[in-house]
């Protein structure tokens, strides 16, 4: 009996992980499509989570601008961004000397359903926020709330 419960738990965790990956991919894809619809912008998804790359790279050669974008999507009331993901975005834009304007964007999408419990949701307004990372700040974990406020997490708080 224990093995069966364990297998069910593993299956549920695998399903949840797959759903999170799909949400992330869809949000990244939406961002890429929005940039591509805008004149003189090109954008690309850069890879999977196993590779240390930003989620999206967007460039405008006419305006000499490049953005590395870390995209977060979810059903909770806050979406965290680990410091190492911000750091890799900063490292990437620093390698492109040809661009005069280089910025890291954090893109947050709070889905129209809020997770209350495992498999339990309530409806809410879909919200999106785009934040420019201030390079003068010390790199740290940060979190964006459903209200669009962004906070630095220090020692996990």
Regions found by a protein language model. Give the residues of each.
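Acidic-basic catalytic patches of nuclease active cores, encompassing PD-(D/E)XK
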Residues: 1-47
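Domain-level recognition of nuclease-like catalytic cores that cleave nucleotide substrates
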Residues: 3, 18, 22, 98, ...
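Alpha-helical scaffolding within the catalytic cores
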Residues: 12, 53-55
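Conserved catalytic cores of phosphodiester-cleaving nucleases, focusing on short active-site segments
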Residues: 35, 56-58, 65-75
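Structural signal for conserved beta-strand scaffold positions within catalytic alpha/beta enzyme cores
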Residues: 45, 70, 106-108
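A generic beta-sheet turn/junction motif
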Residues: 49, 60-62
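Short acidic/glycine-enriched loop/turn segments that link adjacent beta-strands
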Residues: 50-53, 114
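Short, charged, amphipathic alpha-helix that recurs within catalytic cores of restriction-modification
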Residues: 74-106
């Amino acid at each position: 009996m224990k093995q069966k419960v364990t297998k069910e738990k593993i299956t549920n965790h695998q399903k949840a992980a797959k759903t999170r990956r799909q949400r992330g991919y869809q949000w990244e894809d939406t961002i890429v499509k929005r940039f591509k619809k805008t004149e003189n912008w090109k954008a690309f998804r850069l890879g999977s989570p196993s590779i240390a790359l930003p989620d999206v790279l967007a460039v405008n050669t006419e305006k000499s601008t490049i953005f590395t974008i870390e995209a977060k999507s979810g059903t909770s009331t806050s979406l965290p961004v680990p410091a190492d993901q911000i750091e890799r975005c900063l490292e990437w834009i620093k390698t492109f000397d040809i661009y005069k304007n280089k910025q890291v964007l954090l893109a947050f999408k709070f889905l129209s359903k809020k997770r209350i419990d495992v498999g339990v949701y309530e409806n809410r307004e879909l919200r999106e926020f785009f934040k420019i990372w201030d390079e003068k700040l010390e790199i740290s974990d940060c979190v964006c709330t459903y209200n669009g406020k962004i906070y630095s997490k220090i020692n996990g708080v």
